[in-house]
Amino acid sequence: MAKISAKNIRPGELNLKEKLVHINRTAKVVKGGKRFGFNAIVVVGDREGHVGYGLGKANEVQDAIAKGVEDGKKNVIKVPIVKGTIPHQVIAKYGSAKVLMKPATPGTGLIAGGAVRAVLEMAGVHDVLTKSLGSSNPHNVVKAAIKGLQSMSDALEVAERRSKSLKEVFES
């Protein structure tokens, strides 16, 4: 799994909560029958702008979830949130999964399905419109949503990148 660069974020200092997105049972056929294993994709976040995801694999469900949580804590990113929503529209793609996220006015609520909803809830986004296109594989949908949130930048970051003031950015 590709690691996300988490610069200057210490998961130990955050009050991270976890949300299980999907459990998958796998089977290995051996001489004596089938041996089952499990993998779990888990989203962790503090509901205040930090979110990460992790994949855990084990022979027991609880062990897979625990491994997923530990992996998720290693992949935490900062999400820019403006008035409870995202700063701008974004389309992110991972594999065959595509996620469209649009900012929404306060009071709209979190309009998202399954895996994307879990990511946005853990990030602390309250008002957003989303549409999941292409593949509905929860693993790829979560990764596409995280990729989209990671690609966002707030107005201050854009101004710094362009070496302009905040006022100049909004006038252009």
Swiss-Prot record:
Pfam families named among the record's database cross-references: Ribosomal_S5, Ribosomal_S5_C
Domain of life, source organism: Bacteria
Alphabetized UniProt keyword annotations: Ribonucleoprotein, Ribosomal protein, RNA-binding, rRNA-binding
One of the GO BP terms on file: translation
Family matches, as InterPro entries: Ribosomal_Su5_D2-typ_SF, Ribosomal_uS5, Ribosomal_uS5_bac-type, Ribosomal_uS5_C, Ribosomal_uS5_N, Ribosomal_uS5_N_CS, Ribsml_uS5_D2-typ_fold_subgr
GO cellular component: small ribosomal subunit
MF terms (GO), sorted A to Z: rRNA binding; structural constituent of ribosome
Positions of the S5 DRBM domain: 16-79
Family to which the UniProt record says this protein belongs: Belongs to the universal ribosomal protein uS5 family.
Function of the molecule: With S4 and S12 plays an important role in translational accuracy.
Subunit structure: Part of the 30S ribosomal subunit. Contacts proteins S4 and S8.
Domain notes per entry: The N-terminal domain interacts with the head of the 30S subunit; the C-terminal domain interacts with the body and contacts protein S4. The interaction surface between S4 and S5 is involved in control of translational fidelity.
Protein name: Small ribosomal subunit protein uS5
